[in-house]
């Protein structure tokens, strides 16, 4: 029975390029999940967009001496160019700079305001007398009061993940000039999170299918007690507050950006000429998944659900499969540390499926995982080239050369051959279960294990020897190996769409796997094959030294 799946993916700040940490954290797992569900025949809507209004953008604009709009548009266009290179299959990708998004965000604000979930309050905010302005949260840095991390921001500590406000920081300073700010009174609007605390606890306690790290973090945060949070800032860049007399204030990005999932859905529907089509993905039995990095957990398991509860009539998240951090040399990817590995740069030298494979096999699902170029080369050469790619190349080459580019007659299969076919079918069932539950590392491990088993079968049967004395016996062995390849092209497709499409074409099935089902499709005798090209390329050991030198390590 088909399902309807909504996939919301974290919105990247349009202030820098994409690096591997971004891809492993949210974008690759979301794409894997979307491709998997489409192949199952499910209805899928996967949306995201560029976050154009965050303070990181205004900070960069000031550093470069240009407008925030210019910075945001520059990186939005770079993102748009990067997604196809990565094979990210958005149903719709937009930005927070659209009139549709501003309207949707303002409607959400007014709905919550009219219901009493947003209220005005006079608060003390950091004011830099040297810069002569109020400082939004990311313009203030200092030491986290919880974990003592010295690089915490005025909105959140990246080290321990706890949301903060600037007044909580120790040794705080203005990010722009380095001077300590003073605190002055200003009026802001607050989201009444405290009103949703008990309802959120009851709701989260039902989410036993969530990843343990996500569930525990959320419950711990909830049981510490929710504080109301300001949702406006003294800025001139962002979505204007939809109330008269507050022209100098904007909706703050953590409130505004999550509304992008809804505004993107509406924009997608309008682009299809069906303006109400978004509604089926936000109601009924649709399951909503949000793919994010761990620094965004509270915004998607507490704040966004509270906003949806207050608004009413919209589905709450079914799952928030947040990943931990991908690190290098045990440090989080960071431009300031000079250890970021930029996506466009990597893809200018290596195949997209090679990158997707390593990031999938090493995905930080429950704990931080470390990226290394040595592992990149080893896995490419040992697993993609020598195991999976070699299996496809030698089987299809032998069949094309010796059986006129067609699937041969294979006769009666022996027990060993039937066992491999059964294992292939079982692998598809097991990967189906793993992918359904967002266990991506397990799914790709199962697929590669089947490739290893198929190679063992081929080595035992040795069709290159059989063909010299018994062409029919060789045909049986090669046919069974093609059955294994047929299963592998499906299992690997969500992870490795480019090479899976080519393998599917070589096998005579065509390249559009999403038009099939998550089943083992048997090659038909006489089916036309295409002489194969290697699926993957071997990498030289020198790559390790060259790439670490590029990073200055």
Swiss-Prot record:
Q: GO biological process annotations for this chain's record?
A: methionyl-tRNA aminoacylation
Tell me which family the UniProt entry assigns to this protein: Belongs to the class-I aminoacyl-tRNA synthetase family. MetG type 1 subfamily.
User: What's an example of a GO molecular-function annotation for this chain?
Assistant: ATP binding
Motif 'KMSKS' region in this chain: 332-336
Residues annotated to bind ATP: 335
Query: Which residues of the sequence carry a binding annotation for Zn(2+)?
Result: 144, 147, 157, 160
Q: How does it assemble?
A: Monomer.
Q: Which Pfam families does this UniProt record tie to the protein?
A: Anticodon_3, tRNA-synt_1g
Give UniProt keywords alphabetically: Aminoacyl-tRNA synthetase, ATP-binding, Cytoplasm, Ligase, Metal-binding, Nucleotide-binding, Protein biosynthesis, Zinc
Known EC number = 6.1.1.10
The cofactor named in the record is: Zn(2+)
* UniProt-annotated location(s): Cytoplasm
Per the entry, the cofactor note is: Binds 1 zinc ion per subunit.
Q: What is this protein called?
A: Methionine--tRNA ligase
> What reaction(s) does this enzyme catalyze?
tRNA(Met) + L-methionine + ATP = L-methionyl-tRNA(Met) + AMP + diphosphate
CDD domains (alphabetical): Anticodon_Ia_Met, MetRS_core
What the protein does comes down to: Is required not only for elongation of protein synthesis but also for the initiation of all mRNA translation through initiator tRNA(fMet) aminoacylation.
EC primary class: ligase
GO CC annotations, alphabetized: cytosol
Q: Which domain of life is it from?
A: Bacteria
Q: Which InterPro entries match?
A: Anticodon_Met (IPR041872), Met-tRNA_ligase_1 (IPR023458), Met-tRNA_synth (IPR014758), Methionyl/Leucyl_tRNA_Synth (IPR015413), MetRS_core (IPR033911), MetRS_Zn (IPR029038), Rossmann-like_a/b/a_fold (IPR014729), tRNAsynth_Ia_anticodon-bd (IPR009080)
UniProt motif ('HIGH' region) ranges: 12-22
């Amino acid at each position: 029975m088909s399902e309807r799946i909504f996939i919301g993916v974290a919105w990247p700040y349009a202030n820098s390029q994409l690096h591997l940490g971004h891809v492993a954290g949210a974008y690759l797992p979301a794409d894997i999940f979307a491709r998997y569900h489409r192949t199952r025949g499910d209805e899928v809507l996967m949306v995201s967009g560029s976050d154009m209004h965050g303070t990181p953008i205004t900070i960069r604009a000031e550093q470069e001496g240009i407008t925030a709009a210019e910075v945001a548009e520059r990186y939005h266009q770079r993102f748009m160019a990067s997604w196809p290179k990565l094979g990210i299959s958005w149903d719709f990708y937009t930005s927070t700079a659209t009139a549709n998004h501003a309207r949707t965000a303002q409607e959400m604000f007014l709905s919550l305001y009219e219901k009493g979930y947003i209220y005005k309050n006079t608060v003390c905010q950091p004011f830099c007398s040297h810069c002569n302005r109020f400082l939004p949260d990311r313009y203030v840095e200092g030491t986290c009061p919880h974990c003592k991390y010295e690089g915490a921001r005025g909105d959140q500590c990246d080290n321990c993940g706890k949301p903060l406000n600037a007044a909580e920081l120790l040794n705080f300073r203005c990010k722009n000039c380095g001077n300590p700010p003073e605190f002055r009174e200003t009026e802001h609007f607050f989201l009444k999170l405290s009103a949703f605390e008990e309802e959120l606890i009851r709701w989260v306690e039902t989410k036993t299918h969530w990843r343990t790290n996500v569930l525990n973090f959320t419950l711990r945060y909830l049981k510490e007690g929710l504080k109301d949070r300001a949702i406006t800032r003294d800025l001139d860049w962002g979505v204007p507050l939809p109330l008269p007399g507050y022209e100098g204030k904007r909706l703050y990005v953590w409130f505004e950006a999550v509304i992008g999932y809804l505004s993107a859905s509406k924009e997608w529907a309008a682009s299809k000429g069906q303006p109400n089509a978004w509604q089926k993905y936000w109601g009924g039995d649709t399951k909503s998944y949000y793919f994010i990095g761990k620094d965004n957990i509270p915004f998607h398991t507490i704040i966004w659900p509270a906003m949806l509860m207050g608004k009413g009539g919209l589905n709450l998240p079914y799952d928030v499969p947040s990943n931990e951090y991908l690190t290098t040399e045990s440090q989080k990817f960071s431009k300031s540390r000079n250890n970021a590995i930029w996506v466009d740069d990597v893809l200018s030298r290596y195949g997209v499926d090679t990158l997707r494979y390593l990031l999938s096999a090493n995905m930080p699902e429950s704990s931080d995982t470390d990226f290394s170029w040595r592992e990149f080369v080893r896995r490419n050469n040992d697993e993609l080239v020598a195991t999976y790619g070699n299996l496809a190349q030698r089987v299809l080459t032998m069949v094309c050369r010796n059986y006129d580019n067609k699937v041969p007659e294979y006769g009666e299969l022996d027990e060993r051959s039937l066992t491999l076919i059964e294992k292939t079918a079982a692998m598809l069932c097991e990967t189906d279960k793993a992918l359904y539950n967002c266990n991506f590392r397990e799914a790709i491990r199962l697929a590669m294990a089947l490739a290893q088993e198929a190679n063992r079968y081929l080595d035992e049967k040795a069709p290159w020897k059989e063909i010299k004395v018994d062409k029919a016996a060789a045909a049986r062995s090669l046919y069974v190996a093609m059955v294994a390849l047929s299963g592998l092209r499906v299992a690997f497709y969500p992870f490795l769409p480019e090479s899976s499409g080519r393998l599917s074409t070589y096998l005579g099935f065509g390249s559009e796997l999403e038009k099939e089902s998550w089943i083992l499709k048997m090659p038909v005798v006489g089916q036309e094959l295409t002489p194969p090209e290697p699926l993957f390329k071997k990498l030289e050991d020198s790559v390790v030294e060259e790439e670490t030198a590029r990073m200055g390590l």
